[in-house]
């Protein structure tokens, strides 16, 4: 029962916190570049909730990314405004992975002291990755985690070839 894990769903589906044993998820309303002070306060409260176990894997998900990953989206309004302020909040709150979309280019990275994952497009609209000129293929990402080892294993499948993608060719 998915509903059983909700911690805060007052603004569902735009903003909510959800927990299962070993996993704590915070979804932020990052549909526009401005994550205002009210939402930042909510994020801080959600991430520091007594419902969160310190051993939980913590994921934060939102539509717009903290930083640009694809060509044509590296401009104001296409990424979070004041990304360093939000990144500082996420670091202090011990977030394990920040997942975003919008840029339609699969790109796992570490930036601003955080582990970031930009999800690719599943259908039309994949974009070129900044610095490579390569158009990201349609893709699907699967996340697996082990509570015993605190590891997040990410597998991304190229939907054209159905083969696992690697970050070897990424800038």
What name fits each language-model region?
Residues 50-71:
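Short acidic, glycine-rich surface-loop motifs adjacent to enzyme active sites
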Residues 70, 87, 153-155:
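Short, hydrophobic secondary-structure boundary micro-motifs
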Residues 1-57, 77-97, 109-120, 124, ...:
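Extended active-site neighborhood of metal-dependent phosphoesterases/phosphodiesterases
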Residues 60-66, 98-106:
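Histidine-centered catalytic micro-motifs
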Residues 34, 67-68, 125, 149, ...:
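Flexible, glycine-rich phosphate/dinucleotide-binding loops
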Residues 141-171:
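A short C-terminal boundary segment appended to hydrolase-like catalytic domains
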């Amino acid at each position: 029962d998915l509903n059983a894990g909700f911690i805060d769903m007052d603004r569902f589906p735009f903003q909510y916190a959800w927990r299962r044993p070993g996993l704590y998820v915070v979804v932020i309303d990052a549909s526009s570049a401005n994550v205002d002070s009210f939402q930042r306060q909510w994020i801080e409260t959600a991430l520091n909730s007594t419902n969160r176990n310190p051993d939980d894997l913590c994921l934060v998900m939102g539509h717009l990314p903290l930083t640009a990953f694809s060509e044509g989206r590296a401009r104001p309004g296409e990424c979070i405004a004041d990304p360093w302020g939000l990144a500082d909040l996420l670091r202090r709150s011990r977030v394990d992975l920040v997942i975003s979309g919008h840029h339609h280019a699969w790109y796992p990275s570490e930036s601003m002291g955080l582990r970031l994952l930009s999800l690719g497009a599943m259908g039309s609209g994949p974009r070129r990755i900044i610095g490579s000129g390569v158009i990201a293929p349609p893709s699907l990402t699967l996340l697996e985690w082990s509570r015993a080892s605190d590891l997040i294993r990410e597998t991304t499948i190229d939907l054209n070839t159905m083969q696992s993608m690697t970050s070897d060719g990424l800038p």
